[in-house]
């Protein structure tokens, strides 16, 4: 009897995630606001914006879109996996959600982080002259911010690759059983 009560209480604690999921949806609202603000800024300066600034603005918008997609993916998958099944109002259900287990979600998150990091590096590359001009010429490599940003990006890439390989090995071993 005590065991059943404990199990029921533990299972009910999944609903503690629901307010966190709602709070994460507010993050989407904030990202949407920042996206629209950046888009408006870009459009309002269209006649004076340089090509480099246009590309940087576009990369910023892509970055925000990736981030919003990542938040939405984690939000929906977390709710569906841990809280409750989503009741679809219409037939346009999200098909990837049915096939997304925890390992697939980890892989999608890892790949999204790599994409976001790559966009960040691309933005830095577009303003490389400004960044390099702010660094003294005899600065050691370990004090160069671009060096560390590339290292961090490579760590993200290696982590995503290791997660994919680990997932692939685990899946192939489970397939045989």
Swiss-Prot record:
Pfam families from the UniProt entry: UPF0114
Transmembrane segments: 15-35, 54-74, 102-122, 145-165
Entry keywords, A to Z: Cell membrane, Membrane, Transmembrane, Transmembrane helix
Subcellular location: Cell membrane
Annotated GO CC locations: plasma membrane
Recorded superkingdom: Bacteria
Main location: membrane
Membrane topology summary: Multi-pass membrane protein
PANTHER family per the UniProt record, alphabetical: UPF0114 PROTEIN YQHA
Protein family membership: Belongs to the UPF0114 family.
Protein name (Swiss-Prot/TrEMBL): UPF0114 protein HPG27_173
